[in-house]
């Protein structure tokens, strides 16, 4: 199992990937809002990969603004707080789009909730056409429905655009561990895992709905450190970084 893309005669890497970015990464350190320097750095990484020939679609979380489940714990209605989180993802999408355009990369934001003044509606075939033309497509507003995470959105969008793999860029962690490496210095990192191992061990790769969706459709997941320079390019090229989750639990 591999995420390695093909090289064409001109030496460029070919392949279509769905990149899932955590909203917390956009804040530059787990705070609230958007850190322009961090978003610009991410945009530069994506731009380099697109120039090298890959087709990239993006789903961004909204945790740097709102988390529906956490707001629910503070007494808010879950559905309403989830919608607030969806709107937060759109703010992140627009920030990334702005910096991609500054890098000379055409991009389109498509949202699951209609907001015609700032984004296109989510239309899968149109998204694929954009990708084929070398544009980055950024999917916002989650699934457009409460109770679905942006991890699940990323898996669903990846399948619908026929992506080769789901690349999950994490903030501050370089793969999947058997326990939290931030609190346990003895935590062991996995090089690869099967979908079943992730589910039975209850490893915090993504929510179980997303993992099950990937398992049922044999979509590989690569979990890696987002903010390490050059890591998005390494992920697309199939280099051994992070943790690869797939059918066999092996990179062979």
Curated annotation (Swiss-Prot):
Disulfide bonds: none annotated. GO terms for cellular component: cytoplasm. Its EC number is 2.7.4.22. The keyword Cytoplasm applies. Pathway: Pyrimidine metabolism; CTP biosynthesis via de novo pathway; UDP from UMP (UMPK route): step 1/1. Keywords: Allosteric enzyme, ATP-binding, Cytoplasm, Kinase, Nucleotide-binding, Pyrimidine biosynthesis, Transferase. It catalyses: UMP + ATP = UDP + ADP. Its main location: cytoplasm. ATP binds at residues 20-23, 63, 67, 171, 177, 180. Residues 28-33 are annotated as: Involved in allosteric activation by GTP. It is found in: Cytoplasm. The keyword ATP-binding applies. Belongs to the UMP kinase family. Homohexamer. This is Uridylate kinase. The lineage of its organism: Bacteria, Bacillati, Actinomycetota, Actinomycetes, Kitasatosporales.
């Amino acid at each position: 199992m591999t995420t390695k893309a093909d090289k064409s005669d001109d030496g460029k890497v070919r392949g279509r990937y769905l990149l899932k970015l955590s909203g917390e990464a956009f804040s530059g350190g787990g705070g609230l809002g958007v850190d322009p320097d961090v978003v610009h750095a991410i945009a530069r990484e994506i731009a380099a990969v697109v120039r090298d020939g890959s087709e990239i679609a993006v789903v961004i979380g909204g945790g740097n603004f709102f988390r529906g489940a956490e707001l629910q714990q503070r007494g808010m209605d879950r559905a309403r707080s989830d919608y607030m989180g969806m709107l937060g993802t759109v703010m992140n999408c627009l920030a990334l789009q702005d910096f991609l355009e500054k890098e000379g990369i055409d991009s389109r934001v498509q949202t699951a909730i209609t907001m015609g003044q700032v984004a296109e509606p989510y239309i899968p075939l149109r998204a694929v056409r954009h990708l084929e033309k070398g544009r980055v497509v950024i999917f916002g507003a989650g699934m457009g429905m409460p109770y679905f995470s942006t991890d699940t959105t990323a898996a669903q969008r990846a399948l619908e655009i026929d992506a080769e793999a789901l690349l999950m860029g994490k903030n501050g962690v370089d793969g999947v561990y058997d326990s939290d490496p931030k609190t346990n210095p003895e935590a062991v990192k996995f090089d690869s895992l099967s979908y079943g191992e992730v589910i039975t061990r209850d490893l915090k790769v993504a929510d179980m709905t997303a993992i099950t969706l990937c398992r049922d459709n044999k979509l590989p997941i690569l979990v890696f450190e987002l903010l390490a320079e050059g890591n998005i390019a390494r992920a697309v090229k199939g280099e051994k970084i992070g943790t690869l989750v797939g059918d066999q639990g092996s990179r062979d």
